[in-house]
Every structure is written in C-alpha cells, then in structure tokens.
Amino acid sequence: MYRRSYVFQTRKEQYEHADEASRAAEPERPADEGWAGATSLAALQGLGERVAAHVQRARALEQRHAGLRRQLDAFQRLGELAGPEDALARQVESNRQRVRDLEAERARLERQGTEAQRALDEFRSKYENECECQLLLKEMLERLNKEADEALLHNLRLQLEAQFLQDDISAAKDRHKKNLLEVQTYISILQQIIHTTPPASIVTSGMREEKLLTEREVAALRSQLEEGREVLSHLQAQRVELQAQTTTLEQAIKSAHECYDDEIQLYNEQIETLRKEIEETERVLEKSSYDCRQLAVAQQTLKNELDRYHRIIEIEGNRLTSAFIETPIPLFTQSHGVSLSTGSGGKDLTRALQDITAAKPRQKALPKNVPRRKEIITKDKTNGALEDAPLKGLEDTKLVQVVLKEESESKFESESKEVSPLTQEGAPEDVPDGGQISKGFGKLYRKVKEKVRSPKEPETPTELYTKERHVLVTGDANYVDPRFYVSSITAKGGVAVSVAEDSVLYDGQVEPSPESPKPPLENGQVGLQEKEDGQPIDQQPIDKEIEPDGAELEGPEEKREGEERDEESRRPCAMVTPGAEEPSIPEPPKPAADQDGAEVLGTRSRSLPEKGPPKALAYKTVEVVESIEKISTESIQTYEETAVIVETMIGKTKSDKKKSGEKSS
C-alpha cells in the first residue's frame, strides 16, 4: 500500500507602512490662525516626530536593503556549489545499470528455464517410453503367468487321470489274479477228477467236451490277461511321459520366473531413477520460475522507483528553477542581523553531499507477512518574522493541505504463500538505501538554511486566526484557488484540499471560538453534502477559526529529528497539522449555521485584498512531504524509500499575486 501526503503551506506576512502610522499619529491642526503662537510648539513637536519617523523608516529600509544584499550574495555563492541533482543523477544512473544487470540476469534465467524445460521434455519422453516398455513387459508377464497356470492345471488334471488309471490297473490286477486262481483251481479239480474217474467211453467223450470248453475258457482268460498287461504297460509309459513333461514345465516356469524377476527389478530401478531425476528437474524448474517471478517483481519495483526519481527530479528542478531564476531574492522572511559562517559552512555542505552520494546499500531481506502502514507528515514553520520597532506586523496565514492517499492491494496465489525466500548463490542482493539519502538531503537542507538564516530575534506574540474550507477531489482532477495554484495530481485515492485563510484583526474585534473541520471521506469518495437550496458543498467556503498548535512552534531541526526518530521506530506518525484530522475517523456533519454563513470563493478572493493594507509584502512557503509505505509478503520483496523534503519560498507583491490568482481561476 502506497501513501503519499503532500502538505502545502502558505504564509503571508503583511507590514504597514510608516506613513500610515505617522499620519495616524499626526494631530489635527486647529482652525483658528489666531492661536499660532500657542500651537507653534505643538506643530514643531509634530514636525520633529515626523522627521524622526522618516529617519527611522530610512534606517529600516537601509537595514532591509543590507539584508537583501547579503541574501543575494549568499545565493550567488550557493549557485556555485553542486546541488543535490548530481547525487540524484548518479543514483538514477546506478539504478539504470542495476536494471540492465537484472534484465541480463532475467534473460539468462529465461534461457536456463528454456533448457530446463527442454530437458524436462526429454526426460518425460524417456519416462513415457519406459512406461510403455514396462506395460509391454507386464502384459507379457501376465500372459506367461496365465500359460503357466494353464499348464499347472493341465498337469494336475493329468495327474488325477493317472491316479484314476492306477486305481483301475490295481483293480484289474486283483480281478485277474482272482480269475487266475479260480482257473487254476478248476484245472486242479479237473485233473483230480480225471485221475480218479474210471475210463469209459462215455465218460471220456464227456470229459473231452468239458476239457475243450475249459481250454477255450482258459485261452479267453489268458487273452484277456494279456490285454490287461498291455494296457497296464501302456498306462505306465504314459505316466512316465507325463512325469517328464511335468518336470520340464516346472523347470521352464522356474527359469521364466527368475528371468522376469531380474528384468522387472532392473526396470523398477530404472523407473525409480527416472522418477528421482524428474522430481529433481521439477524442483529446479520451480526454483527457476520462482527466480523469474522474483526478478520480474524486482524489475517492476525498480521501474517504479526510476519513475518516482524522474518525477522528483522534474518537480524539484521546476521548483528550484522558479525559486532561483524567477524570484530568487525574497526567499527568506528574516532580514535583521543576518550572519553567515563561511568557514565551516562549505565543509558542512561538502560533508552533507558526501553523505548523500556515499549512502551505503542495505541488504534486502524478506519481512514478515504482515503489511505495515506508515504515514509521515512533516510540517516546517519559518523561525521568525520581520519585526520593526515602530511598526506593528499583522500576520495573515493561508494553510493549504492536500492529502493524497493511494492504496493498492496485491493478491497472490495460494502456493506463493508457502514458498521459502529466494536464496541466491554468492553475496545477497543490495538495494539503494532511501532512508540515508533522505537524511542526507535533510542534512544538506539544514546546512544551507543555517548558512543563510539570520539569528532568531524575540518575537512579539501575534494573534493567529485561520479560516478553513474543505474541498474533496477524486480521480484525475485538482482544485484551483484564485490565490494559490495546485498542480494536477493523478489521484488514485482520495484527495482532500483544505484551504485556511486568515483575516487581519483590528482593534475591537472579538476572537471567535476554534472549531474542527470536517475530515475527508475514505476510499477516495467525494463527499457532496448539499444544502437545502441544492448548492454543493465544494462551492461553500466554511469559516472556521483554528488556534495555533503548539507543535507548530517547533523549529525545523527539531521536526527533522522527530521525523528521523519516527522512521527508525517504524511507527506511523500522527498528523498534527491544524485544521486536519485522521481521514479514517468519521465526524458528524457540519452545522447548518456554518454553511449558511459561507460565501462563494470568488467573492472571498475579491474581498480579501481589501482587508489588508495596500502594497503589503507577502511571502509564500511551500513544503512537500512524501512518504511511501513498504508492502511485503513472504514471496515478494519491495523497496522502501523516503522522499526528499525541499522547501522553497517565493516572494511576490499582492498585485502580482492577484494577477496569478486570476490566471489560475
């Protein structure tokens, strides 16, 4: 989130001429000429007072002329010294060189990223080929496993069949043995019958028939027994063949398993190696992409800084040109007792410039993931005003405050929140130290101011009454005051322009009570609070009286030291300017009485010169303060630079000022 606060202060100091005081002090002459002898002494005294007043006025003019002559000599000597533009130019040149180096580094990283992408593609293609080969091997292994399972099932089936056949063979053997025993028993019985029976022709013929039948049966039984033996031998041969086939299949399956196990282990090792290489390549690619993103962010930040430096140089160049060329003489309000220390002033200026140019770079580190807001608003008041002994100075102050708030939030991806900070090889990257540069410019400014500043003189307490008007502006727009010109500022946030005008108080006027102005709305919205008759609020100058704040009486050195302490403590600095409050705190609307008593800006600008004495000398002090806040997360690094505070004083007569106001309107 970037915040820029521009505080423009304008002061007017008016001085009455001594002739008015003398005319006011001059007594009226009596009308009667007969009293000439009595009033001659009074006339002589009045003439003596007038002569003394003219002599005193001549002395004051002579002192003022001497002070202006010393200021002119001081500015001529300052013109010979080297200004802060050289330091800024060198800083800009170094930043440009840094940008060129970063661009070369980015190109190198892009080439490395391209090579890494090409290597990743090659590894991916190899990995895909290996995956395809692995799939083919897996399919082949599955097919072989299926064939082995089928062979095992077929072997089991053959074993079962062989077992059944073995059972059948054993049953047939038992049956044939029983049949053989029965046949032998029959033969033995027949032989006994033949031996025991008497020979007879009938018995012999019958026995022969039975013997023939029995021999036939024995032959049939022997043929059956031979067939059973042949079947048994055939089954035994099949059994031996099946056992041999089973053994061969078991050996083939075992060798295939061993071979495929070795190949699968080898392929698994290759796949694991390729996976590790791919993971390493992905990590390298992720790191390269992270480096590229970091370089892109750093390049964008450096471009923004270069643009800001260009704008600062252009603005300060224009302001210094207008201050030193157009109206360089009445730049300081004090003209009494100007003392210049040339002995140590040059050394101090040289040392301040060396501090600016030799600002050491600081290490760029990632802060915590907590955005911090820091707003630095610095006010610098002039140390003293010109006080003449017989003259009574009436001060008329005009305060213009412009607060420009620019807020931008960056959203990143969720994965960038967990990314560790970038660690590069070699020494860490250095960035310009804007704080030291700003402190150096502040020191240079104080040295120059102390060199040409006149010593403080006791001031008589002056009564300060301010009147203020708020005008809210949004977008690319600006507010133009007839007496003060504000350049157009590209406003991405809300712009609040506060104009406070002082009126010259004469004797008998009553001091009004101070009131607080209405703060501008948030988020850059235009607060158009209209009256009952429909007139917008930005055309109604609201008169408010503001008491001088005690903080404004501090010197510029104390304020610079306070600002440095605030920058070191990194705490947001509260706004202490009179007539302005925190823009984030809403306030109840203004009463209708103040709105009814307001007048149009043109009428006010025309009526203001009539209040002060004619031919009054006016001084104008413009102070620009810019503070840029740092945004940081764990994945993005930015730079923090504080702005350069430059104060210029432009002196014009009231007639020239009125002409410039009419041109701006």
From Swiss-Prot:
Keywords: Acetylation, Cataract, Cell membrane, Coiled coil, Cytoplasm, Cytoskeleton, Eye lens protein, Intermediate filament, Lipoprotein, Membrane, Myristate, Phosphoprotein, Repeat. Residues 1-40 are annotated as: Head. The record marks E457 as: Interaction with MIP. Proteolytically cleaved during lens cell fiber differentiation with increased fragmentation as fiber cell age increases. The record marks D433, G434 as: Cleavage (by CASP2, CASP3, and CASP7). InterPro entries: BFSP1 (IPR042358), IF_rod_dom (IPR039008). Expressed in the cortex and nucleus of the retina lens (at protein level). Belongs to the intermediate filament family. This is Filensin. It comes from Homo sapiens. The gene is BFSP1.
